[in-house]
């Protein structure tokens, strides 16, 4: 009975003062976000990440993101690009599981070319416009390429430097 009385008072007040009571539709203007993980899969990770903590961390992060406006991708590299996924929606459980399986299948081997991995990730991020972009590098160190390879450490480091400058210009 008390609730009905309060409800009637509210209705009467709304009728007496209609200009004071109104509803406004609030539109959320969240900026979409693309996150790309650049994952070092070189042989040194076998000893420096024995428990595969870096990969587990990325998988755990994937589990925590369920928003439609956040897209996640990755680039797995050593001295070549091993696998990648351009940023994509993981709002559905199936999408999250598929991405986690891809990341879980990554193996550690060979040498390290950080410039190559970051450059590839930068290309994947640059493709999408009107999106906030975030790049996360997971590595145990520096570029490590043996002498006599067609690509030198200096070339890799120059490419890395160029990518960092591009990322700064693009707000990544």
Named regions from a protein language model:
Residues 85-87, 128, 146-149:
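Short, well-ordered secondary-structure micro-motifs
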């Amino acid at each position: 009975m008390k609730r009905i009385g309060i409800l009637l008072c509210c209705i009467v007040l709304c009728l007496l003062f209609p200009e004071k009571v109104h509803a406004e539709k609030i539109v959320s203007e969240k900026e979409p976000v693309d996150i790309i993980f650049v994952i070092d899969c070189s042989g040194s990770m076998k000893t420096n990440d024995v428990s595969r903590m870096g990969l587990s961390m990325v998988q755990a992060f994937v589990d925590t993101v369920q928003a439609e406006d956040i897209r996640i991708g990755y680039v797995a590299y050593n001295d070549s690009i091993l696998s990648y996924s351009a940023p994509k929606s993981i709002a559905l459980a199936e999408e999250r599981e598929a991405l986690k399986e891809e990341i879980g299948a990554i193996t550690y081997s060979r040498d390290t070319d950080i410039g190559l991995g970051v450059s590839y990730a930068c290309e994947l991020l640059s493709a999408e416009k009107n999106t906030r972009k975030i790049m996360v590098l997971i590595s145990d160190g520096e570029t490590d390429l043996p002498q006599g390879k067609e690509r030198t450490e200096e070339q890799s480091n120059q490419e890395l430097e160029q990518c960092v400058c591009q990322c700064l210009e693009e707000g990544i």
